[in-house]
Structure formats: C-alpha cells, structure tokens
Amino acid sequence: MSGGGGDDVVCTGWLRKSPPEKKLRRYAWKKRWFILRSGRMSGDPDVLEYYKNEHSKKPLRIINLNFCEQVDAGLTFNKKELQDSFVFDIKTSERTFYLVAETEADMNKWVQSICQICGFNQAEESTDSLRNLSSASHGPRSSPAEFSSSQHLLRERKSSAPSHSSQPTLFTFEPPMTSHMQPALSTSAPQEYLYLHQCISRRTENSRSASFSQGTRQKSDTAVQKLAQSNGHCINGVSNQVHGFYSLPKPSRHNTEFKDSTYDLPRSLASHGHTKSSLTGSETDNEDVYTFKMPSNTLCREFGDLLVDNMDVPTTPLSAYQIPRTFTLDKNHNAMTVATSGDSAIAPPPRPPKPSQAETPRWGSPQQKPPIGENSRSVAATIPRRNTLPAMDNSRLHRASSCETYEYPTRGSGESASWSAESPGKTAVGRSDSASSDENYVPMNPGSSTLLAMERAGDNSQSAYIPMGPGPHHFDPLGYPSTALPIHRGPSRGSEIQPPPVNRNLKPDRKAKPTPLDLRNNTVIDELPFKSPVTKSWSRINHTFNSSSSQYCRPISTQSITSTDSGDSEENYVPMQNPVSASPVPSGTNSPAPRKSTGSVDYLALDFQPGSPSPHRKPSTSSVTSDEKVDYVQVDKEKTQALQNTMQEWTDVRQSSEPSKGAKL
C-alpha cells in the first residue's frame, strides 16, 4: 500500500461497495479494500480510497471527503445476499456510495471515523424523531438473526416510504405479520419498542380497505336481512346483484322464470312485443304467477336508506338495485293486478288515450302520479317499456307505461321495492327483433347514463330529474325513454338532486398512466437501501459547500488545504475564461474587476484593442492586490501570445485592413 507514506491512515478493512444507483440491478456489489486517510499532518485532502485487494498499489477510486454531505448508518436493504449485513452510506455531491460491513462493530467504526474527519454532527431530524427508537433498537442488535427479524419487519413499509426520505416514517404492519413476529420482538427488544411496532392502526386501516365501512355494512346487512326475512321473493333482483356482498336467501318463487339472472325480463313486460305473444298459456291462466306481496313501509324505508347511503355496492346496469317488476295480466289485456299493502285506496290517475299504433317508440299524453304522503320517501324506479297497451283499468295502466324514470312513492302505492331489474336494451335484444332496439339501450355506467339522458333531453332539464311532487311524467323529444338515474334520496325539490362523482379511471378499457410511475418507485425501493427507525444520520449544519463554509465546518487542520486549493483553482480559472471573454469586449471594459478572475479576464481582453488598452489597463491593475499582479504577469505572457497568433491568422485569412493589430505586443 504505497499510497502516500506520510498520510495518517485512520481505518482500513474490507467493505462491500455498491455500483452506481442506475446499475444496482445489473452489476454486483464488489468487495474492496478500503483505506481512510486523513490529511491532518501532510496537508492533503481527507480521502477514502478503495483498492481491488490488500496488495494493490493503485486505488480504483479516491473519494474526496471534502465533498461528503451526509453519512447514514443502519440502513435496510432487501437484497437477498445482503439482508443480514450492516449497510451505511456516504453521500457526496457526485454519487451516493452504499457500503456493507460484515459486523455492526465494523460499521460503527467506519461511520465514527468518517464523521470525526468530516466534522459531522448527528442530524437533528434523526435525534428528535428517532431518539427512543435508536436507543432501544439499534443498541441491542448484536446478532444477524435479530437483525434479520427486524429487517424482515422493515420490509413491510417499503411501499409507503421513499428510498431517500429525510425523516423515516414510523411503519405499521399487517396483522398476520405482527402476530408472526411478536415472539421474536418480545424476547430481544424492550417493551416500548414493542408498542411502536405492534400498533393497531394498521388493523383498522385493513378493515377500512374493504368495499365499505363497518357501520355502513352493518346497517346495510340489517336492512337487507330484514327485507329478505319479511318478503324473500320481493328482492329477487337484489339477490342476483349483490350476492357477493350480502348474504341473502335465495328466492323460493319464480326461479324457473328468472333463472337467477337479472337480464331475464318477466314475460308480461317484454318490450317491443305484443303482450299476447309474450305470455304463455300457463302464465296467463294463472292469475297469481306475477303477483307478490309488498314489504312494510318501515322495511321499504330501510331498504331505501341502504340504496342511498351505501354507494360501495357495485352498480347495476340501470344504476339502481333492480328487482324484476311483476304484474298479473289476463289473456284479454283487461286486468293487470298489482298486489299492494293496506294503503291501496288511492284515487287512480286519469286514463291516458290509447295509442294509434301497436308498435310505437313512445305514446301519447302523460299520466298522473298518485299523491305522496308526508313521511313517505322515494327512490328512483324504472319500469320496463311497453309499447303494446291493452285495455286496462286506469290504476293498472298507470304502472305499465313505457320505461320511465320517476320518483316512485314508498308509502302511497306500496311498490317501492318492486323495481325493474332488467336493462330494456338487453331485453330487446334477447326477446324482440324490433328495429328500434337501440332506443332502449341504457349504458351500464351511472355517470354515462346521466350524461346520455341530459344530451338527449337538450335544454329540457326536467327530463333527466323528475321532482317528487305530483305532475306529468316527462319524455324526451326523440322518443327515447329517460335513462335510469343513480340512486338518490328523494328530496323535496328536483333541483337538489346531484349525480354522484364518477371515477373514469376505473373503466376496464382505460389505461391508467400512473401505473409505470408506481412500478418505478417500487423498483427503486427494492433496489436501494432505505432508512429505517434504527437509522442514524450525520451531516453538516450548513449544506452549502463553498470555500468559506468548507473552512468553517471543517477541522482546523484542513484550512491550509482549502487555501492552497483556492490558489490552484485561480490559476486554472483564468485561462479557461480567456477565449470566451475575448469576444464581448465592450461589456468587459466597463466592469471594474472586483474578483480575482474577473480582473484578469478584463486585463487580457484589453490587449487587442488598438489605442484603448493603455487607459483601461492602469485602473484595472491598480484595483487588484500585488499578489494578483504576479498572476497576471505569468498568465498574460503565455495566453496573450497565443491569442495574438490566433488573431494574426484570422487577419491573414480575412485580409484585414489593420495588419498591425496582430503584430502589436
């Protein structure tokens, strides 16, 4: 090791060195022989050198500790072969060197030696935020097995913290990992360390990561279970839609008609088809095939709360919990019985006129809605489209109209939970070959359905949102049925209804752009060692590394080094600026040269002006010190001759009219 015999060798040993940050995955971590040299006695800079082996004479690289900014000890690394090692880093202005020691004593020895030479103090953020953790967890770590257990725990936080965060964040664990690691921690760490690592905030967060919160979920389950127990066959469509989220009993009736699918429309309501043709003989003969009882008003109100409050349940094709609408129709289209509760003594609305054609996209005059009670609440209901209108009673015809979106009362008719679960577009495709099937298509996205309804309606804002009060049902001018609205709590005025926010990044065909960024961040965390609660950091108070701050922060022995370096850099600085400053002569003549390099540049630039250099040379030389005059003479003699030769060649080529300018010295 003939790398400077007079240097003070502070520390030597084997360390495993990291490749550059961009090559951590492709290149291996090489084991090198490191020597820490102090220039206290010789006046040389403090350096950290590493060699290929102990007997090498030429170092592979010399790390100048004058540019060292920070040292971190006790880093965590997920590389398999380095999980049980002790990692520390040296951050310089050019590169961050990650070094791996075999034992904790070696790491502490290197870190203390480097910090002592550089004059580092422990960072305030490390002492404030990690005072308890550092004393409790970093001290007792004496074996690789214990460090492996803690490092195994630290790997859980890699997706939530950056690789170079200035202040390590306290991490939480998944409940299985916490229970698995609890015995190891309880035997090797103090009690307060266990409290920090076994905090239960992650458990509540894990419960919140489900589709809905506990409070909403319990409320929703209670409402659905009550509704299912009261009237199981009434929620056939809901059991098909939300069977993944709620445990609902299977319907005991109509299994053969619906076949456990929300797109099987009751045959009496098939759109674009004659009612006689859509009804079979067995269905029309039995008067009770499509008749069922309604739940009580209390249960209907709870079910309305479930639909309005719990927005985490997946949306259905019509943005509502849709239950197959069931009616009882006879062969002659003269009766359509709808089973109601005790509140069925309401006056029927006026009978609309019979349409002129059997197959029309829409039909004539609007119909009235029965009055609503004071305490009744409404939800958005969608009734399947019917184009063939038989001769019915007024009260029955009120419920067999085209596919409309309106506020259906909860108490007034007792039919609030009996909604349509079928998308009219799907039904038209499956059961009818009518040419106007596109008119019945309803998008599955709640946001897009609302926008589609508003676009079709034009300026008619009332076609999209219908007020609660009694009034005619609206149809859009193109003959399309108004699309189903998202689930809302029925307000007293239609102007208060607002559609829910739509996250369009959740569409299946949409490619989210942040995905590559997340993957890149994860790979960086996997590749680079990161800080942990046991990490200690040392750095300077002032991180601006100019000449004055370096002399202030460095030890006294290095002040002579910085002064000699500044003198050497001055000589090298003047020749580099000569070619640049030779062209802007007028701006250079007006500057007085307050600095060393500026004065020398002005002096050299004025040599080539005929008649003007002598008046300007005297004030520029008089404004600087005598030591700098010596530098001017030494540099001017060489560089001025070179610049004169260049100018002479330029004048010869251009055939300048002033050939004497290049010959002047």
Swiss-Prot record:
BP GO annotations: cell migration; integrin-mediated signaling pathway; intracellular signal transduction; osteoclast differentiation; phosphatidylinositol 3-kinase/protein kinase B signal transduction; positive regulation of cell population proliferation; positive regulation of epithelial cell migration; positive regulation of mast cell degranulation
Modified residues (Phosphotyrosine): 263, 290, 441, 632
SUPFAM superfamilies, sorted: PH domain-like
Positions occupied by motif SH3-binding: 348-355, 499-508
InterPro entries named in the record: Gab1-4-like, PH-like_dom_sf, PH_domain
Processing after translation: Phosphorylated upon EGF stimulation. Phosphorylated on tyrosine residues by HCK upon IL6 signaling. Phosphorylated on tyrosine residue(s) by the thrombopoietin receptor (TPOR), stem cell factor receptor (SCFR), and T-cell and B-cell antigen receptors, gp130, IL-2R and IL-3R. Phosphorylated upon stimulation of TNFRSF11A/RANK by TNFSF11/RANKL.
GO function terms (MF aspect): phosphatidylinositol-3,4,5-trisphosphate binding; phosphatidylinositol-3,4-bisphosphate binding; protein domain specific binding; protein phosphatase binding; transmembrane receptor protein tyrosine kinase adaptor activity
Name of a matching Pfam family: PH
Protein family per UniProt: Belongs to the GAB family.
Role: Adapter protein which acts downstream of several membrane receptors including cytokine, antigen, hormone, cell matrix and growth factor receptors to regulate multiple signaling pathways. Regulates osteoclast differentiation mediating the TNFRSF11A/RANK signaling. In allergic response, it plays a role in mast cells activation and degranulation through PI-3-kinase regulation. Also involved in the regulation of cell proliferation and hematopoiesis.
The name this protein goes by in its record: GRB2-associated-binding protein 2
Gene field: Gab2
